[in-house]
Amino acid sequence: MNYNLDIKKETLSNGLQVILVHKPDYQKSLFLLGAKVGGFDIDQRVDGQVIRHKSGIAHYLEHQMFYLDGEDVSDLFANLQCSTNAYTSYTETAFYFSTTADVKKPLKLLLDFVENYRKLTRIPVPMQQLFPVSSLFDDLR
């Protein structure tokens, strides 16, 4: 089946793969930023030691990413006339938005909240049990 799509692929100097799919006559734009980290990725190496996290940590952290500097990112996207969501599979985590409005500000927001490291500020008490007592937990508080 031929969908007659104009697809451009490029790998940036930092390794990020960019895929642009142009669909003529479509009014809506969708942007997705994904990482090859998912539910199966529960081991983390810190200072030469392997820390094994409980399953569910990737999905939990996906939800925590929606809080940027104390604000709910969903509200920030809504103010830009966008809908947003995310998913975590066994092998990847992705964040995306769609809009019929201008894409420059929401694209910058997507890149800012996914790329920029910051300390997580919202860790509910029950989820603290997911983290071992280590410097990792201190970084997440």
Residue ranges: model-predicted function:
Residues 1-73:
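His/Glu-rich zincin catalytic helix
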